[in-house]
Amino acid sequence: MAKIRIFELARSLNMTNPDLLDRLKEMGIEAKSHLSSLEDDIVEKVRQGVFRTEVEKPEKVEQKRVRSNVIRKRRQPVKSEAEPEAEAPAAQAPEAEEVTAPTAEEAVPEEAADADVSAKAETPTAPETPEEAEISVSEEAPVEEAADQVPPTDEAVDPAEAAPAEEESSPSRKKAKAKKHQAAKIIKFPDAPQRLSNKGVLEVVDDTAPADSPAAPAAATPAGEKDKKPSRKDRKKRGKTESVETEEAVPVKKKGVFKRKEIVEGVALYDRTRGRMRKKGKGGAKVPGGAKTQITTPKAIKRKVRINESISVAELAKRMGVKASEVIARLMGMGVMATLNQQVDFDSAALVAAEFEYEVEKASATEEELLELNVEEDQGNLKKRAPVVTIMGHVDHGKTSLLDVIRQSRITEGEAGGITQHIGAYKVNTANGEVVFLDTPGHEAFTAMRARGARATDIVILVVAADDGIMPQTIEAINHSRAAGVPIVVAVNKIDKEGADPDRVKREASDHGLVPEDWGGDTMFVNVSAKQKLGISDLLDMVLLQAEMLELKANPDKKARGVVIEAKLDPGRGPVATVLIHEGTLSVGETVVCGIHYGKIRAMFDDKGAPLDQAGPATPVELIGLGGVATSGDDLFAVGDEKSAKTVSENRQQKQRTEDLARKDSISLENFFEKMQEKEEKVLNIIIKADVNGSCEAIADSLQKFSSGEVKIHVVHSAPGTIIESDVTLASASNAIVLGFNVRPSPKVRALAAEENVDIRSYDIIYDLIDDIKKALTGMMSSTFEEEVLGRAEVRELFVIPKKGTIAGSYVLDGKIERGRPARLLRDGVIAYNGVIGSLRRHKDDAKEVASGYECGIGIENYNDIKPGDVIECYFLREIKPEL
């Protein structure tokens, strides 16, 4: 069922929101605010209730003059039919009352309203007396009243004050008073307060009925008075029955301007503008009670806040026009502890804004719309692309050597220690087509790199040495491939080596779910030798066969998308990213978004270093032009304009800042004791600088594994690039050591490090780096001690020797008693004293130790309270060095 909001219904009924809410309350309909929704049946009920015309019985109106230009009339209860009518027909008045028009200074404008108001003079249909003129009232159309309009307040009028007002029957006296104090009438409520002219005939039409409904017939009353139904505003004010009757100017003899009395009901007689103007005039009458201050409520269209993905608490409060403390209080009520400058997400901002009757909408398109993530692909535009193959396996099993043979290059010779410590992307032309290869590290420290390689690939070549079999990193590579849903081709390498056993590899692989095809499984096994260049063509044929089964296709005519394989900071070229294009075509000069960074591509190079203008699907490229060093594994998107790229980048940066602030440790009453205990821990602060971003990530992850309950590694800073002076300054301030991987500091940086007493360590092989940090952490840890009991002796007799104290004549029960060892005195199985054996004698000779079955004299240092029957237990503490 369709619904309509209250502010929309009020607009269609030409009413203000507060009036309609009051009307709904009178009708028994609950509504919290003008943003609430109503069902269709309730809306129809409200429309009928608003437009229904009620005809009441005429009531006698008693007029009282309060001021010279205001007459109050009080409705009297209708008399019963039994009472005789006391009033006789009034004689016809000779003519209407005459007053002169007020001066411009005395004219008082009314405040703005949305409906036009006009008055129409009616010809008297009944005889008039000189004291009372016939008053005609037309139905009042509903209008939106100004927010700060104040309803007239009732005044208690004494009979003594009312009597003189009724006795004023002389037209001359009325003329004099009207000339002095009469104010001009309003013919229209403008949108803004303005001064109205007092010239001409001003007429007022009552606006309590809809404009399209016919006016109710006026019933003639005694003395020419006409009955008037109480307005909705009067009913709201506790059923007040007083109405205000103002005097209009009657014909002025000089200018021929005719004015008459008319009832003005439901309109405020005082507002801010009118009050200010009356203070200027000397004869202006004061309104009793003054003006009531009301808070201006913005229109519904203005009660909206447009934000991006997040907004600060201070900015949200500013846009809603409320105090920031109130917004923080509402957030605390929702369980969100936020400060003035802290960012809140879109959902939290929407909930808080709803508390203040505001709506929240997104100011810009979403990231999915800007990056066109949900655009459906036309299958007719897809074309065949080259497969992406990742080579994975245990360290030193021959992965890079195998790739060397395929590429006919010598990569291994350039690797430090003969092991791969980066992820590389290469495109190879074979006899059967192009193949893109990704070479991943095999060391355990590069787990994240292998995971990224598995996610970015179509096929995995799992290299296993025939003489080693399945190793820990081999199992990890299998798990990464399964998690990515990528098919595996097993390459059994080093088959030419002595002790090679390909069948052993098949058996161990079968235990992990890789069953060979010749054993009834679905996994391809190929025997190869990178050193002897055996089986390479068979391996490529298997890879291309697997690729044909996958039917790999991509659309080269759309905006490019890719993934960052590796990123680094080049001193001469700036941020450099190795990207594998998945789909679309990337061109030089295009604007791209990559993680939290964006930029315009200035140059592209292939895996051999040749410049490129365009790169199609399944093409590894090295691009320059990003605003910062991208994170390995980030997705790259080509966008149409720089503005969209900047919007996406700023939103992502804001999210990252919010997450970083949330991760920062803060002290509270709940975690105070825990933080105090952490301060007692030994912390090794480290700054990591490497040649590429992936190496920084791998080193940081490996070192974090060494943290224990006693020692902890804190990575203060980690970034790609060479070691610079700011790194040394940061290390000096944070008491950290600087670890460089494949980078070297300049002589100037070394001099600064020596001056600041900062330790800089440079490594080329990750083995050495991890071992050194492990030794450093071990040295920081405290040793533990284990108690070992040497022997026990029973006290049988006591000897007191001057200057020596009490000597216990004892019998060694088991083990041995050694001089200088710690000992404890046991009495009835309870420890009576802990000390050290100070003296040990056997047959008047000092002894170093006494074995079991022998008698001896034992003296305990600084203790003489020994009794026969006590047991002396000798022991020592064995030191156990910590290990990580």
Swiss-Prot record:
GO terms for cellular component: cytosol. GO terms for molecular function: GTP binding; GTPase activity; translation initiation factor activity. Residues 439-442 are annotated as: G3. Residues 493-496 are annotated as: G4. The keyword Transport does not apply. Residues 87-106, 207-223 have a biased composition (Low complexity). It is found in: Cytoplasm. Residues 418-422 are annotated as: G2. Disulfide bonds: none annotated. Residues 58-248 are annotated as: Disordered. Residues 384-553 form the tr-type G domain. Residues 66-77, 172-183, 229-239 have a biased composition (Basic residues). Residues 393-400 are annotated as: G1. Keywords: Cytoplasm, GTP-binding, Initiation factor, Nucleotide-binding, Protein biosynthesis. Belongs to the TRAFAC class translation factor GTPase superfamily. Classic translation factor GTPase family. IF-2 subfamily. One of the essential components for the initiation of protein synthesis. Protects formylmethionyl-tRNA from spontaneous hydrolysis and promotes its binding to the 30S ribosomal subunits. Also involved in the hydrolysis of GTP during the formation of the 70S ribosomal complex. This is Translation initiation factor IF-2. The gene is infB.
